[in-house]
Amino acid sequence: RHAANRYYTHLFLGPVSSAVMLGGRTDFFLWRPLFVDYSYNFTARNYKNGNFGNLTSVSNTESMKFLENFLSLGFGFPVTHRSAFVIRLNGGQERYYYSLDRASYKENYYEDLTTLNYISPKIELRRSSLDRMIFPHSGTSLSLSGIYLYGRDRFVPSPYSRDEQRLRKSKRDVSWWGARIVWNQYFQISGSKWFSLGYGAEAVVTTIPTLSNDKVTRMLMPAYRPTLHSQTVYMPEYRAKRYAAVSVMPTFDFSDRFFLRTGIYAMFAERFRPTDDRMRYIVDASLVYHT
């Protein structure tokens, strides 16, 4: 039995990241409530000015530009009042612009290109009782997901790479599996109206192979980006084939809507290079007001 249709358009424009999403969702009832969602997604991220927003210079970011176009089709149903199981199929193209020769560049003469055309099924079981999607103050969330990706990796070197390093165009088929678990909880400290706490854990395992070069292989690895600011820069050290991470988020409450959220995040990652550190840390503080 048909229940409802919903259509939407999302547009986000920013100096580092821009995105467009056109889609819809159909809810219906057979033996239980079911839904189908469908969307076209375009994302552009420009990390060529990779230190955007930093108050001081840093050395752990790299210049990179990323474009993605893909179609998504999902089918799911509720498991409980607050949880759902979703099967999804994504297919599209990712384009990575970067330089094999230098971490920071501005001239297109140094810009190498890797294109990945792919199709990727995904399954996910998610549960959430969070009071807000961004900067939640109470509740728990849990996500268990697994993916398979099959695609073609195509590398086009820049004029500099062709002239000085004698690199050539290349194509190859690639495939891999991956699994991720993410859990977070937020709660009020008993007996204290001024202080609350959040903590979380995340673990990822993949079988990503070596692609056309080490730089783009790392770009395609899962990233640990627990804060909003960490999502606006490209930091290779926080990408890994396999990793585990934990977080603690003390919160100082001035009112129900106004609070200071702090966070300490630690990531234990598989080494990509012998010189890589296994432990990585992020410290964050955000002054939050919810309207």
Model-derived segments and spans:
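Gram-negative/organellar outer-membrane beta-barrel architecture
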Residues: 1-130, 237-244, 260, 291
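Outer-membrane beta-barrel translocator domains and adjoining extracellular loop/strand segments
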Residues: 21-25, 48-57, 97-106, 136-138, ...
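A generic structural micro-feature
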Residues: 65, 115, 173, 277-279
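Short, small-residue-rich loop/turn micro-motifs
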Residues: 91, 148, 266
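Small/polar glycine-rich anion-binding or flexible loop at a beta-alpha turn
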Residues: 265-267, 277-283
